[in-house]
Amino acid sequence: MDTLTRFLPEHLQQNQLPEALGGVLLSVVSACTEINAKVRLGALAGVLGMAGTGNIQGEDQKKLDVIANNIMIDTLKANPAVAGLASEEEDSFVSAGENGRYLVLFDPLDGSSNIDVNISVGTIFSILEKPEGALATESFLQTGRQQLAAGYVLYGPQTQLVFTFGHGVYMFTLNAENEFVLTKEKPKVPESTKEFAINMSNRRHWLPPVQQYIDELLAGETGTRGKNYNMRWVASMVAEIHRILMRGGVFMYPQDKRDPSKPGKLRLMYEANPMALILEQAGASASNARQDILGIRPESLHQRVAVIMGSSEEVDYLNRLHSK
Protein backbone atom coordinates (compact mmCIF):
# COMPACT_ATOMS: atom_id res chain seq x y z
CA MET A 1 0.00 0.00 0.00
CA ASP A 2 1.18 3.52 -0.80
CA THR A 3 2.32 5.82 1.95
CA LEU A 4 1.47 9.50 1.62
CA THR A 5 5.09 10.39 0.87
CA ARG A 6 5.12 7.94 -2.06
CA PHE A 7 1.64 8.74 -3.31
CA LEU A 8 1.83 12.52 -3.26
CA PRO A 9 4.61 13.23 -5.83
CA GLU A 10 2.94 10.95 -8.38
CA HIS A 11 -0.50 12.47 -7.76
CA LEU A 12 0.88 15.99 -8.15
CA GLN A 13 2.67 15.09 -11.36
CA GLN A 14 -0.34 13.31 -12.87
CA ASN A 15 -2.54 16.33 -12.27
CA GLN A 16 0.09 18.97 -13.09
CA LEU A 17 0.03 20.45 -9.60
CA PRO A 18 2.94 22.41 -8.09
CA GLU A 19 5.32 20.57 -5.79
CA ALA A 20 5.06 23.47 -3.34
CA LEU A 21 1.32 22.86 -2.97
CA GLY A 22 2.06 19.29 -1.97
CA GLY A 23 4.59 20.63 0.50
CA VAL A 24 1.90 22.72 2.17
CA LEU A 25 -0.26 19.62 2.55
CA LEU A 26 2.69 17.79 4.12
CA SER A 27 3.13 20.66 6.60
CA VAL A 28 -0.53 20.36 7.58
CA VAL A 29 -0.11 16.60 7.97
CA SER A 30 3.00 17.08 10.11
CA ALA A 31 1.09 19.43 12.42
CA CYS A 32 -1.87 17.06 12.62
CA THR A 33 0.40 14.13 13.49
CA GLU A 34 1.67 16.17 16.44
CA ILE A 35 -1.88 17.15 17.42
CA ASN A 36 -2.87 13.48 17.24
CA ALA A 37 -0.21 12.61 19.81
CA LYS A 38 -1.63 15.22 22.21
CA VAL A 39 -5.22 14.05 21.67
CA ARG A 40 -4.31 10.40 22.25
CA LEU A 41 -2.64 11.10 25.59
CA GLY A 42 -5.45 13.33 26.86
CA ALA A 43 -5.47 13.46 30.65
CA LEU A 44 -2.06 11.76 30.80
CA ALA A 45 -0.54 14.84 29.16
CA GLY A 46 -2.62 17.29 31.19
CA VAL A 47 -4.23 18.73 28.05
CA LEU A 48 -7.92 18.27 28.91
CA GLY A 49 -10.23 20.91 30.38
CA MET A 50 -10.76 24.59 29.76
CA ALA A 51 -8.06 27.08 28.81
CA GLY A 52 -9.79 29.96 30.60
CA THR A 53 -9.85 32.06 27.41
CA GLY A 54 -12.29 32.72 24.57
CA ASN A 55 -12.00 33.06 20.80
CA ILE A 56 -13.36 35.62 18.33
CA GLN A 57 -16.57 33.58 18.10
CA GLY A 58 -17.30 34.18 21.78
CA GLU A 59 -16.69 30.50 22.51
CA ASP A 60 -14.78 29.24 25.55
CA GLN A 61 -11.53 27.60 24.48
CA LYS A 62 -10.40 24.18 25.61
CA LYS A 63 -6.73 23.64 26.38
CA LEU A 64 -6.43 21.47 23.29
CA ASP A 65 -7.99 24.19 21.11
CA VAL A 66 -5.10 26.46 22.03
CA ILE A 67 -2.46 23.73 21.78
CA ALA A 68 -3.69 22.55 18.37
CA ASN A 69 -3.90 26.11 17.08
CA ASN A 70 -0.33 26.88 18.13
CA ILE A 71 0.97 23.67 16.55
CA MET A 72 -0.74 24.48 13.24
CA ILE A 73 0.54 28.05 13.19
CA ASP A 74 4.13 27.18 14.14
CA THR A 75 4.37 24.33 11.63
CA LEU A 76 2.83 26.23 8.72
CA LYS A 77 4.83 29.40 9.35
CA ALA A 78 7.98 27.29 8.99
CA ASN A 79 7.02 26.52 5.37
CA PRO A 80 8.16 29.43 3.13
CA ALA A 81 5.44 28.61 0.58
CA VAL A 82 2.77 29.70 3.10
CA ALA A 83 2.02 33.43 2.90
CA GLY A 84 -0.68 33.60 5.53
CA LEU A 85 -2.97 31.70 7.86
CA ALA A 86 -6.49 32.07 9.17
CA SER A 87 -7.80 30.09 12.13
CA GLU A 88 -11.04 29.77 14.03
CA GLU A 89 -9.04 30.60 17.14
CA GLU A 90 -7.46 33.84 15.82
CA ASP A 91 -9.24 37.20 15.58
CA SER A 92 -7.44 38.14 12.36
CA PHE A 93 -5.17 36.47 9.82
CA VAL A 94 -1.57 35.56 10.65
CA SER A 95 1.20 36.62 8.26
CA ALA A 96 3.80 34.01 7.31
CA GLY A 97 6.29 33.76 4.42
CA GLU A 98 6.85 37.06 2.62
CA ASN A 99 7.21 35.29 -0.73
CA GLY A 100 4.66 32.57 -0.06
CA ARG A 101 2.15 31.51 -2.71
CA TYR A 102 -0.49 29.90 -0.52
CA LEU A 103 -2.99 30.70 2.20
CA VAL A 104 -4.12 28.07 4.70
CA LEU A 105 -7.37 28.36 6.64
CA PHE A 106 -8.22 25.89 9.39
CA ASP A 107 -10.26 24.84 12.36
CA PRO A 108 -7.49 23.35 14.50
CA LEU A 109 -9.77 21.17 16.62
CA ASP A 110 -13.31 20.74 15.37
CA GLY A 111 -15.72 19.18 17.86
CA SER A 112 -13.55 20.06 20.84
CA SER A 113 -16.59 20.05 23.14
CA ASN A 114 -16.26 16.26 22.85
CA ILE A 115 -12.60 16.01 23.79
CA ASP A 116 -13.09 15.51 27.53
CA VAL A 117 -15.49 12.59 26.92
CA ASN A 118 -13.25 10.82 24.37
CA ILE A 119 -15.43 11.25 21.28
CA SER A 120 -13.91 11.80 17.82
CA VAL A 121 -12.61 15.27 16.97
CA GLY A 122 -10.60 16.55 14.03
CA THR A 123 -8.73 19.27 12.15
CA ILE A 124 -10.28 20.83 9.02
CA PHE A 125 -8.19 22.77 6.48
CA SER A 126 -8.48 24.68 3.22
CA ILE A 127 -5.67 25.86 0.90
CA LEU A 128 -6.05 28.90 -1.37
CA GLU A 129 -3.74 30.72 -3.73
CA LYS A 130 -2.58 34.11 -2.47
CA PRO A 131 -3.71 36.91 -4.79
CA GLU A 132 -1.21 39.50 -6.03
CA GLY A 133 -0.41 42.38 -3.70
CA ALA A 134 0.01 42.88 0.02
CA LEU A 135 -1.53 40.30 2.33
CA ALA A 136 -4.84 41.49 3.76
CA THR A 137 -8.09 40.04 5.03
CA GLU A 138 -9.48 40.41 1.50
CA SER A 139 -6.78 38.01 0.26
CA PHE A 140 -8.59 35.20 2.07
CA LEU A 141 -12.13 36.11 0.97
CA GLN A 142 -12.34 33.71 -1.95
CA THR A 143 -15.20 31.39 -2.82
CA GLY A 144 -15.02 27.70 -2.06
CA ARG A 145 -14.68 27.02 -5.78
CA GLN A 146 -11.28 28.71 -5.66
CA GLN A 147 -9.85 26.23 -3.15
CA LEU A 148 -6.74 24.46 -4.39
CA ALA A 149 -7.06 21.75 -1.77
CA ALA A 150 -9.22 20.84 1.19
CA GLY A 151 -9.14 18.14 3.80
CA TYR A 152 -9.46 17.00 7.36
CA VAL A 153 -7.78 14.71 9.85
CA LEU A 154 -10.10 12.64 12.03
CA TYR A 155 -8.75 11.73 15.48
CA GLY A 156 -10.88 8.69 16.28
CA PRO A 157 -10.39 4.96 16.88
CA GLN A 158 -8.22 5.30 13.76
CA THR A 159 -6.50 8.54 12.81
CA GLN A 160 -7.41 9.25 9.20
CA LEU A 161 -6.41 11.91 6.69
CA VAL A 162 -8.91 12.79 3.95
CA PHE A 163 -8.09 15.33 1.24
CA THR A 164 -8.72 16.45 -2.30
CA PHE A 165 -6.84 18.61 -4.79
CA GLY A 166 -9.96 18.64 -6.96
CA HIS A 167 -9.12 15.32 -8.60
CA GLY A 168 -11.01 12.90 -6.38
CA VAL A 169 -10.91 12.23 -2.66
CA TYR A 170 -8.19 10.14 -1.02
CA MET A 171 -8.17 8.62 2.45
CA PHE A 172 -5.10 7.64 4.45
CA THR A 173 -4.83 5.90 7.83
CA LEU A 174 -2.03 6.51 10.34
CA ASN A 175 -0.09 3.31 11.04
CA ALA A 176 2.00 2.29 14.06
CA GLU A 177 5.09 3.91 12.51
CA ASN A 178 3.32 7.30 12.31
CA GLU A 179 3.03 7.06 8.53
CA PHE A 180 -0.18 7.78 6.65
CA VAL A 181 -1.03 4.84 4.37
CA LEU A 182 -3.54 4.99 1.50
CA THR A 183 -6.64 3.00 2.48
CA LYS A 184 -9.39 4.31 0.18
CA GLU A 185 -9.39 6.01 -3.22
CA LYS A 186 -12.14 8.15 -4.68
CA PRO A 187 -15.05 7.18 -2.40
CA LYS A 188 -18.53 8.01 -3.71
CA VAL A 189 -21.44 9.12 -1.52
CA PRO A 190 -24.71 7.32 -2.40
CA GLU A 191 -27.36 9.63 -3.90
CA SER A 192 -30.07 8.28 -1.58
CA THR A 193 -29.88 7.57 2.13
CA LYS A 194 -31.85 6.60 5.23
CA GLU A 195 -29.67 8.50 7.72
CA PHE A 196 -29.77 12.11 8.83
CA ALA A 197 -27.83 14.14 11.38
CA ILE A 198 -29.21 17.22 13.10
CA ASN A 199 -29.40 18.65 16.62
CA MET A 200 -33.07 17.94 17.38
CA SER A 201 -33.02 20.06 20.55
CA ASN A 202 -33.12 23.16 18.32
CA ARG A 203 -36.35 22.15 16.57
CA ARG A 204 -38.41 25.00 18.03
CA HIS A 205 -35.96 27.51 16.53
CA TRP A 206 -35.88 26.10 12.98
CA LEU A 207 -37.49 27.73 9.97
CA PRO A 208 -40.70 26.00 8.72
CA PRO A 209 -39.07 24.15 5.76
CA VAL A 210 -36.62 22.39 8.09
CA GLN A 211 -39.37 21.54 10.58
CA GLN A 212 -41.45 20.07 7.75
CA TYR A 213 -38.50 18.11 6.39
CA ILE A 214 -37.58 16.52 9.72
CA ASP A 215 -41.25 15.75 10.48
CA GLU A 216 -41.42 13.90 7.16
CA LEU A 217 -38.31 11.87 7.98
CA LEU A 218 -39.62 10.99 11.44
CA ALA A 219 -42.95 9.83 9.95
CA GLY A 220 -41.04 6.98 8.34
CA GLU A 221 -42.54 4.53 5.88
CA THR A 222 -46.11 5.64 6.60
CA GLY A 223 -45.29 9.26 5.76
CA THR A 224 -44.56 11.29 2.63
CA ARG A 225 -41.07 9.86 2.14
CA GLY A 226 -42.20 6.24 2.29
CA LYS A 227 -39.21 4.86 4.18
CA ASN A 228 -37.78 4.74 7.69
CA TYR A 229 -34.83 6.96 8.62
CA ASN A 230 -32.28 6.74 11.41
CA MET A 231 -30.93 9.82 13.17
CA ARG A 232 -27.28 10.34 14.09
CA TRP A 233 -25.68 13.21 16.03
CA VAL A 234 -22.07 13.38 17.23
CA ALA A 235 -21.67 17.18 17.58
CA SER A 236 -18.39 16.93 15.67
CA MET A 237 -18.56 18.03 12.03
CA VAL A 238 -15.52 15.95 11.08
CA ALA A 239 -17.11 12.78 12.48
CA GLU A 240 -20.47 13.53 10.83
CA ILE A 241 -18.99 14.24 7.39
CA HIS A 242 -16.66 11.24 7.59
CA ARG A 243 -19.63 8.94 8.22
CA ILE A 244 -21.44 10.43 5.22
CA LEU A 245 -18.36 10.02 3.05
CA MET A 246 -18.15 6.35 4.02
CA ARG A 247 -21.83 5.32 3.78
CA GLY A 248 -24.05 8.26 2.86
CA GLY A 249 -26.41 10.45 4.85
CA VAL A 250 -27.27 14.11 5.23
CA PHE A 251 -25.83 16.52 7.82
CA MET A 252 -27.64 19.73 8.73
CA TYR A 253 -26.84 22.75 10.83
CA PRO A 254 -29.61 25.00 9.47
CA GLN A 255 -30.38 28.64 9.97
CA ASP A 256 -32.72 29.30 12.87
CA LYS A 257 -34.73 32.20 14.27
CA ARG A 258 -32.68 33.02 17.37
CA ASP A 259 -30.24 35.58 15.93
CA PRO A 260 -30.87 37.06 12.47
CA SER A 261 -27.26 38.31 12.37
CA LYS A 262 -26.04 34.69 12.39
CA PRO A 263 -27.39 32.79 9.38
CA GLY A 264 -25.87 29.61 10.78
CA LYS A 265 -23.45 28.24 13.37
CA LEU A 266 -20.67 26.80 11.22
CA ARG A 267 -17.99 28.97 9.63
CA LEU A 268 -17.89 29.24 5.85
CA MET A 269 -14.18 29.64 5.22
CA TYR A 270 -12.62 26.85 7.25
CA GLU A 271 -15.49 24.45 7.98
CA ALA A 272 -18.22 24.57 5.33
CA ASN A 273 -16.06 25.29 2.27
CA PRO A 274 -13.48 22.51 2.71
CA MET A 275 -16.14 19.94 3.62
CA ALA A 276 -18.28 21.03 0.67
CA LEU A 277 -15.39 20.54 -1.75
CA ILE A 278 -14.63 17.08 -0.37
CA LEU A 279 -18.26 16.00 -0.59
CA GLU A 280 -18.74 17.43 -4.07
CA GLN A 281 -15.66 15.54 -5.23
CA ALA A 282 -17.32 12.40 -3.83
CA GLY A 283 -20.56 13.00 -5.74
CA ALA A 284 -22.52 14.58 -2.87
CA SER A 285 -24.05 18.05 -2.51
CA ALA A 286 -23.66 20.98 -0.11
CA SER A 287 -25.86 24.06 0.19
CA ASN A 288 -27.09 26.71 2.60
CA ALA A 289 -30.65 25.88 1.40
CA ARG A 290 -30.51 28.74 -1.11
CA GLN A 291 -27.30 28.18 -3.08
CA ASP A 292 -24.30 25.89 -3.30
CA ILE A 293 -21.86 26.43 -0.43
CA LEU A 294 -18.95 26.63 -2.87
CA GLY A 295 -20.55 29.56 -4.71
CA ILE A 296 -21.04 31.81 -1.68
CA ARG A 297 -19.04 35.05 -1.90
CA PRO A 298 -17.52 35.55 1.57
CA GLU A 299 -17.79 38.91 3.30
CA SER A 300 -15.70 38.22 6.40
CA LEU A 301 -13.10 35.79 7.67
CA HIS A 302 -15.32 34.25 10.33
CA GLN A 303 -18.58 34.38 8.39
CA ARG A 304 -21.20 31.88 9.50
CA VAL A 305 -23.41 29.93 7.16
CA ALA A 306 -26.30 27.47 7.25
CA VAL A 307 -25.20 23.99 6.18
CA ILE A 308 -26.99 21.10 4.45
CA MET A 309 -24.53 18.48 3.19
CA GLY A 310 -24.54 14.92 1.98
CA SER A 311 -26.51 12.57 -0.26
CA SER A 312 -27.77 14.65 -3.17
CA GLU A 313 -31.39 13.45 -3.13
CA GLU A 314 -31.89 14.75 0.41
CA VAL A 315 -30.01 18.02 -0.11
CA ASP A 316 -31.98 18.73 -3.30
CA TYR A 317 -35.29 17.89 -1.61
CA LEU A 318 -34.64 20.25 1.31
CA ASN A 319 -33.51 22.97 -1.10
CA ARG A 320 -36.85 22.64 -2.91
CA LEU A 321 -38.77 22.99 0.36
CA HIS A 322 -36.96 26.28 1.00
CA SER A 323 -37.76 27.57 -2.48
CA LYS A 324 -41.54 27.18 -2.09
Swiss-Prot record:
Record keywords, A-Z: Carbohydrate metabolism, Cytoplasm, Hydrolase, Magnesium, Metal-binding
Locations listed in the record: Cytoplasm
Pfam families attached to this UniProt entry: FBPase, FBPase_C
EC number(s) given by UniProt: 3.1.3.11
Record InterPro entries: FBPase_C_dom (IPR044015), FBPase_class-1 (IPR000146), FBPase_N (IPR033391), FBPtase (IPR028343)
Cofactor note: Binds 2 magnesium ions per subunit.
Gene Ontology, cellular component aspect: cytosol
Highest taxon of source: Bacteria
Gene Ontology MF term list: fructose 1,6-bisphosphate 1-phosphatase activity; magnesium ion binding
Quaternary state and interactors: Homotetramer.
UniProt protein name: Fructose-1,6-bisphosphatase class 1
Organism: Neisseria meningitidis serogroup A / serotype 4A (strain DSM 15465 / Z2491)
